């Protein structure tokens, strides 16, 4: 870790404790800053707050007093806290510096960074790159929005390692010098407008990922959205990925992934399903190769990586039937992607919390659905949907019962897909719990060895 001197003796206000705030506060203290931690919640029993107080840090919970700004501190803000919060908006009015802890990760580490942002696909791309580094026996450390605090991981990184960091638009708003060696924008669609205000502001936040790049750096973008990249002042080398066009970068031709004219692998030999995941794969392969990963390691990942848990996750086969866990599909858009990912007949397990919405937008994606098994509060709605499209529909009490009922109707080469299109809270505490039960139920039907 670099002994960064730029914060020594400076007043720093960490707003929002949580995991990233806790790690940022400890790091700032280590760097010699005068640290105050503030959180709107009750911290009287919070173990992290107590730990920071033992270190001599000032911790204030329960409210955000504006008097905390009187010392003109640098603010390190939890990315989830909106700029509309009075303390933050007042800090903006006063012209105070407002950072997120991901900026700290850059300031303290010499390790090059592969940074991934986008509306969809961030976690999958980040995880794919990490797996490719692992299989190449190079050190690639996952961090950021994927669940590992960037500033904590950066402290462990050696100069020869890579930091592979997933970044949200919230995190990117709070950077100043942050400069990834390789930046990826998977795609940009309308999202988080309650936070950013307008689509253009959201896009501008995403574009910050490449603003500090130099001629020695690389930017990887979706060719279909190349018009969203502002080229004025852009210094980095731009490469594209495309599933339909030959581009300067990586693309698909005659079913094969092509990199600089080199044929890597046929898409049918890739384990991770779905056309949307093919775009994620292209971006990850290009970034990994630019980072020094061998082609052999890339191929090893593509022929083994089955996805992020609960996100169109391949969980195994029973005879000729493959099972996929897409429990994280808590809305119809996610289920559209899932249903569109297979050419084989599908036994579709669906249902969950009723939020009052309909499901007609799924109809164009149901052509390969052979059987529907419905459960949860939306069971009646989804049953009617299936029957209206001439599908064979079975009612189940829950996910376990649905998997049990699969065994009565399954035929050779059917794909069994849990993609609920609904939140889990009517029957399960989390989508993870729902997905885990699906996996357990599948395993219970495997032949005994």
From Swiss-Prot:
Enzyme class: ligase
InterPro entries: Mur-like_cat_sf (IPR036565), Mur_ligase_C (IPR004101), Mur_ligase_C_dom_sf (IPR036615), Mur_ligase_cen (IPR013221), MurD (IPR005762)
Any one GO cellular component localisation term in the record: cytoplasm
Keywords: ATP-binding, Cell cycle, Cell division, Cell shape, Cell wall biogenesis/degradation, Cytoplasm, Ligase, Nucleotide-binding, Peptidoglycan synthesis
Involved pathway(s): Cell wall biogenesis; peptidoglycan biosynthesis
Reactions listed under catalytic activity: UDP-N-acetyl-alpha-D-muramoyl-L-alanine + D-glutamate + ATP = UDP-N-acetyl-alpha-D-muramoyl-L-alanyl-D-glutamate + ADP + phosphate + H(+)
Binding site for ATP: 118-124
Record GO biological process: cell division; cell wall organization; peptidoglycan biosynthetic process; regulation of cell shape
EC number: 6.3.2.9
GO molecular function (one): UDP-N-acetylmuramoylalanine-D-glutamate ligase activity
Location in the cell: Cytoplasm
NCBIfam families per UniProt: murD
HAMAP family reported in the protein's UniProt record: MurD
Sequence similarity: Belongs to the MurCDEF family.
Function of the molecule: Cell wall formation. Catalyzes the addition of glutamate to the nucleotide precursor UDP-N-acetylmuramoyl-L-alanine (UMA).
Designated name of the protein: UDP-N-acetylmuramoylalanine--D-glutamate ligase
Primary gene name: murD
């Amino acid at each position: 870790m670099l002994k960064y001197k730029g914060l020594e003796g400076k007043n720093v206000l960490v707003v929002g404790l949580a995991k990233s705030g806790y790690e940022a506060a400890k790091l700032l203290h280590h760097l010699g800053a005068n640290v105050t931690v503030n959180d709107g919640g009750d911290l009287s029993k919070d173990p992290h707050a107590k730990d920071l107080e033992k270190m001599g840090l000032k911790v204030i919970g329960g409210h955000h007093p504006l008097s905390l700004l009187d010392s003109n501190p640098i603010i390190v803000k939890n990315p989830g806290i909106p700029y509309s919060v009075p303390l933050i908006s007042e800090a903006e009015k006063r012209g105070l510096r407002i950072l997120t802890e991901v900026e700290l990760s850059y300031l303290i580490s010499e390790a090059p960074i592969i940074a991934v942002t986008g509306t969809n696909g961030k976690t999958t791309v980040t995880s794919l790159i990490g797996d490719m580094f692992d299989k190449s026996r190079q050190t690639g450390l996952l961090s950021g929005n994927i669940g590992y605090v960037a500033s904590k991981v950066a402290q462990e990184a050696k100069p020869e390692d890579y930091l592979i960091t997933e970044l949200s638009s919230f995190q990117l708003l709070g950077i100043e010098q942050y400069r990834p060696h390789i930046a990826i924008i998977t795609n940009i669609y309308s999202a988080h407008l309650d936070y950013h205000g307008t689509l253009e502001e959201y896009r501008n936040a995403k574009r910050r990922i490449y603003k500090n790049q130099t001629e020695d750096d690389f930017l990887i973008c979706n060719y279909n959205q190349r018009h969203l990249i502002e080229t004025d002042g852009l210094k980095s080398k731009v490469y594209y990925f495309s599933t339909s066009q030959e581009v300067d970068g990586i693309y698909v031709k005659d079913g094969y992934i092509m990199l600089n004219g080199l044929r890597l692998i046929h898409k049918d030999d890739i384990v991770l399903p779905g056309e949307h995941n093919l775009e994620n794969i292209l971006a990850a392969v290009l970034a990994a190769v630019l980072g020094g990963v061998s082609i052999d390691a890339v191929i090893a990942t593509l022929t083994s990586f089955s996805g992020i848990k609960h996100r169109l996750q391949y969980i195994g086969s029973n005879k000729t039937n493959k099972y996929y866990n897409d429990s994280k599909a808590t809305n119809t858009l996610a289920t559209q992607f899932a249903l569109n990912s297979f050419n084989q007949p599908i036994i579709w397990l669906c249902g969950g919390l009723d939020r009052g919405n309909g499901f007609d937008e799924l109809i164009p994606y149901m052509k390969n659905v052979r059987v529907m098994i419905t459960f949860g509060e939306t069971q009646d709605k989804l049953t009617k949907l299936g029957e209206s499209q001439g599908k064979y529909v079975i009612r189940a009490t829950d996910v376990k019962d649905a998997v049990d009922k699969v065994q009565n109707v399954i035929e050779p080469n059917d794909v069994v897909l849990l993609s609920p299109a609904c939140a889990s809270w009517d029957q399960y505490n989390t989508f993870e719990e729902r997905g885990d039960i699906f996996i357990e139920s599948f395993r219970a039907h495997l032949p005994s060895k």
